[in-house]
Amino acid sequence: MLLGDFGTSYSKFLDLASARPEPYIIPSKELRSVHRVTIATGHNGKRFSDRYVNELTVLARGGERLIAEDDFVLLDCGSRDIKFIHYSNGCLNNMGWNNECGASMGFSIELLERYYDLDFHELPLPDRPFSVTCGVLGMSRIFDAVQVP
């Protein structure tokens, strides 16, 4: 069984039929019609499978399977949107999908990384979060926070 998450920038795959399943990534611009999967999710998922599962459902089920905590928040910052799942006491508490204010944030973060040649593992965390209500409008705060040597 081949699973696929067909995002705008990257597509992620996992072949559960292999002896040691390992995920792999392909830039979405390199996808061709031969990239058919058993079950798909993501922005372009319906183009590559007859069985499509909503991204919030996939995020919630994956969190249940992979996270041993009763209380957690999952955040998926994608190229076109931001999704979150919140579990409390082992039960789904809340979920959301922002494709307006969150639009392009993942892509913008990736552009910043490439433009400034950043290693996000090396950057210090800010003392406090940015006080913005819109990701696109908050870009100036992010640019200000990136200090280039």
Task: Label the model's feature ranges.
Residues 1-61, 71:
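N-terminal glycine/serine-rich phosphate-binding loop of ATP-dependent small-molecule kinases
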Residues 7, 53, 57, 102-106, ...:
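Electropositive phosphate-/nucleotide-binding environments in soluble metabolic enzymes
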Residues 8, 79-82, 112:
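Membrane-embedded alpha-helical core segments of multi-pass
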Residues 15-19, 86-91:
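Short acidic-glycine loop/turn motifs at beta-strand connectors
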Residues 39-43, 78-88, 135-140:
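Acidic-glycine-rich active-site phosphate/pyrophosphate-binding loop
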Residues 49-90:
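Conserved phosphate-binding catalytic cores of ATP/NTP-utilizing and phosphoryl-transfer enzymes
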Residues 67, 71, 113-116, 146-149:
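Structural signal for hydrophobic packing residues in well-ordered secondary-structure cores
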Residues 89-139, 144:
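Glycine-rich phosphate-binding loop plus the immediately following alpha-helix
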